[in-house]
From Swiss-Prot:
GO biological process, one term: L-methionine salvage from methylthioadenosine
Pathway per the UniProt entry: Amino-acid biosynthesis; L-methionine biosynthesis via salvage pathway; S-methyl-5-thio-alpha-D-ribose 1-phosphate from S-methyl-5'-thioadenosine (phosphorylase route): step 1/1
EC number: 2.4.2.28
Protein name: S-methyl-5'-thioadenosine phosphorylase
Record carries keyword Transferase: yes
This protein's record includes keyword Glycosyltransferase: yes
Organism in which the protein naturally occurs: Leptospira interrogans serogroup Icterohaemorrhagiae serovar copenhageni (strain Fiocruz L1-130)
Family statement: Belongs to the PNP/MTAP phosphorylase family. MTAP subfamily.
Keywords of the record: Glycosyltransferase, Purine salvage, Transferase
PROSITE patterns (alphabetical): PNP_MTAP_2
Binding site for phosphate: 13, 55-56, 187
Length: 287
């Protein structure tokens, strides 16, 4: 791929395109992990070259466990992406996080069960640090932009990622609250883990659509409820992104550069050649 796109936007439920983007090209590349969720749009947005990828595909035909995260992140890495801003709907586990509120999580609890969450294994072992799953630098820029446009946004919250595609039971919802989780979704993992291994700064912007099912007297979450509130939030998300784009992709967060090089532990002579061949697409300088 001949583009040098530094910024990627991953759209979640209800965000399948980016209004105002001047399209240059659509690509649907092959990667060693298959094809991405859908065609990646490359274009200018507010004068900046970006890539846009709908996580669930246009028309929402991929459930959370089916999203080809490995291919998605690999394809964006090949474009030159250094920063990813991902959007997602979430359920609120806290009274103060109301439906339609925006949230910037800083921590994740992994409750997925059947998802491969690494590019490594099968003869090449690596252990990437993940204590801070999101980019503090990127999060700070998003928070500052939200303040600039007068958008109240909840900061430093804990996001629990469940397997899905079914929503939580009441017992699970109360359990997550007791653990200190503030919001819940089905898509931050393994997306965030793979972005970390690929040395891409990553932050998810969460939009609360419901109170999950823990709140007494409140209707339990439904798809209709999620979509209705996402539609209401669309204009706010566009307003935030139209300002945020100016502080993205300017080389402000290169803290992950070369980090994976020092996470690989397998001796060169013991590495599986087939795995090395795949990893070379992501890390040509390491293999």
């Amino acid at each position: 791929m001949s583009y040098n796109v530094r910024v990627a936007i991953i759209g979640g439920t209800g965000l399948y395109s980016l209004e105002g983007m001047e399209l240059i090209e659509e690509i649907f590349p092959d990667t060693p992990w298959g094809k991405p969720s859908d065609k990646i749009k490359i274009g200018k947005y507010k004068g900046k070259l970006i890539a846009f990828l709908p996580r669930h595909g246009i028309g929402h035909f991929l459930s959370p466990p089916e999203v080809p995260n490995h291919a998605n992140i690999c394809a964006l890495k090949q474009l030159g992406v250094e920063e990813i801003v991902a959007f997602s709907s979430v359920g609120s586990l806290r009274e103060e996080i109301k439906p339609l509120d925006f949230v910037l999580p800083s921590q994740i609890i992994d409750r997925t069960r059947f998802r491969n969450s690494t590019y490594f294994g099968n003869g090449v072992v690596a252990h990437a640090p993940f204590a801070e799953p999101f980019s503090p630098n990127l999060s700070k820029r998003i928070a500052q932009t939200a303040k600039k446009i007068g958008l109240e946004i909840h900061l430093d919250k804990t996001l629990v990622c469940m397997e899905g595609p079914l929503f939580s039971t009441k017992a699970e919802s109360h359990l997550y609250r007791s653990w200190g989780a503030d919001i819940i979704n089905m898509t931050v993992l393994p997306e965030a883990k793979l972005a970390r291994e690929a040395e891409i700064a990553y932050q998810m912007i969460c939009m609360s659509t419901d109170y999950d099912c823990w709140r007494e007297g409140e209707e339990s979450v439904t798809v209709e409820m999620v979509i209705a509130n996402l539609t209401k939030n669309a204009e706010t998300a566009k307003k935030l992104l139209s300002e945020l784009i100016h502080v993205l992709g300017n080389g402000d967060d290169l803290s992950l550069k070369n980090s994976t090089r020092y996470s690989i532990i397998t001796a060169p002579e013991k590495r599986n050649p087939e795995t090395v061949k795949k990893l070379r697409v992501l890390f040509p300088e390491y293999f």
